[in-house]
Amino acid sequence: MAATVKKTGSKKSKRNVPNGVVHIQSTFNNTIVSITDTSGHVISWSSAGASGFKGARKGTPFAAQTAAEAAARRALDQGMRQIEVLVRGPGSGRETAIRALQVAGLEITLIRDVTPLPHNGCRRPKRRRV
């Protein structure tokens, strides 16, 4: 029987990444914040659901703020200082997440809206009657 080898230390090495890109996907139900380096490798991520919110509270601006703060904290630990922000989606947490990144100490150099707009593609869902 083979002997088990015990690993020591963490699997991820601490990289020093000064510049990065923050992808904020904000839907009506949740907000996901991913922070990558300039080549697209994910350094840290967080979401409203991962921050402890459940159900309808995941779609609130406060949930987006806490998700952005958590992701920014981990990125700052890896040495990130300057970021570009790419925002996607129509959700309520867009501006709050950007403000939380700025307050956390990251310098924002660019904010771009990359929400996909159809050139009359798929049929829209039917209107809700409440």
From Swiss-Prot:
<dbReference type="GO" id="GO:0005840">
    <property type="term" value="C:ribosome"/>
</dbReference>
<comment type="similarity">
    <text>Belongs to the universal ribosomal protein uS11 family.</text>
</comment>
<dbReference type="Pfam" id="PF00411">
    <property type="entry name" value="Ribosomal_S11"/>
</dbReference>
<dbReference type="InterPro" id="IPR019981">
    <property type="entry name" value="Ribosomal_uS11_bac-type"/>
</dbReference>
<protein>
    <recommendedName>
        <fullName>Small ribosomal subunit protein uS11</fullName>
    </recommendedName>
</protein>
<keyword id="KW-0687">Ribonucleoprotein</keyword>
<dbReference type="GO" id="GO:0006412">
    <property type="term" value="P:translation"/>
</dbReference>
<dbReference type="InterPro" id="IPR018102">
    <property type="entry name" value="Ribosomal_uS11_CS"/>
</dbReference>
<dbReference type="GO" id="GO:1990904">
    <property type="term" value="C:ribonucleoprotein complex"/>
</dbReference>
<dbReference type="InterPro" id="IPR036967">
    <property type="entry name" value="Ribosomal_uS11_sf"/>
</dbReference>
<comment type="subunit">
    <text>Part of the 30S ribosomal subunit. Interacts with proteins S7 and S18. Binds to IF-3.</text>
</comment>
<dbReference type="GO" id="GO:0003735">
    <property type="term" value="F:structural constituent of ribosome"/>
</dbReference>
<keyword id="KW-0689">Ribosomal protein</keyword>
<dbReference type="InterPro" id="IPR001971">
    <property type="entry name" value="Ribosomal_uS11"/>
</dbReference>
<keyword id="KW-0694">RNA-binding</keyword>
<dbReference type="GO" id="GO:0019843">
    <property type="term" value="F:rRNA binding"/>
</dbReference>
<keyword id="KW-0699">rRNA-binding</keyword>
<comment type="function">
    <text>Located on the platform of the 30S subunit, it bridges several disparate RNA helices of the 16S rRNA. Forms part of the Shine-Dalgarno cleft in the 70S ribosome.</text>
</comment>
